[in-house]
């Protein structure tokens, strides 16, 4: 297994809304694995929004489903819900949908503001070469929405050493992982799995634990009992 640790400089922050979000779009404190994998795949599939996956169609990011990803905040930030002008016609009654008065509305949308802050993303995989992983890591341009621009400050490539047992981490992990010691900085969220890359299918929900303080928003270190984890440049990322 190899890993890529990517240090991303956020231009203003990022916004990734929660699954099944409707008219009120609350957001995540950290981008989920599917968002991180989509950002990595952009360097290879830029300009391709749809791909044939056999008998189905979906996002080209589906080809990267064997890549494991997680993230943490290197800087402090703030979560807020901005008022954003969005299309709301599909929430209206059928007789209202063609009325210009009901096409747009103001919607509270979750965002993490961290101007000039740093987001650290780790990818672990055995499905590509070090050279390709490094090239794609340097090609990341945004996280989340198209306006959530980032600049790659540094990329660290190396061998991911598989470990298990007790360890400390600041990266998020699935809630099936046992947390030991203090449990004061734990936020439970629902992400989704890779079937969400397939058009017309909904990704199954997966519960994760984010070791963060919510205000100011910052990643915190927690101790866990891991079955599958990897040492990546002096840190640990936990996947089960």
UniProtKB/Swiss-Prot annotation:
Assembly notes: Part of the aCascade ribonucleoprotein complex.
InterPro entries: CRISPR-assoc_prot_Cas5_N (IPR013422), CRISPR-assoc_prot_Cas5a-typ (IPR010153), CRISPR_Cas5_sf (IPR053725)
UniProt keyword Glycosyltransferase, yes or no: no
Keyword RNA-binding attached: no
Name the UniProt record assigns to this protein: CRISPR-associated protein Cas5 3
Function: CRISPR (clustered regularly interspaced short palindromic repeat) is an adaptive immune system that provides protection against mobile genetic elements (viruses, transposable elements and conjugative plasmids). CRISPR clusters contain spacers, sequences complementary to antecedent mobile elements, and target invading nucleic acids. CRISPR clusters are transcribed and processed into CRISPR RNA (crRNA).
Native source organism of the sequence: Saccharolobus solfataricus (strain ATCC 35092 / DSM 1617 / JCM 11322 / P2) (Sulfolobus solfataricus)
Any one GO biological process: defense response to virus
Family listed: Belongs to the CRISPR-associated protein Cas5 family. Subtype I-A/Apern subfamily.
Ranges in coiled-coil conformation: none
Superkingdom assignment: Archaea
Keywords, in A-Z order: Antiviral defense
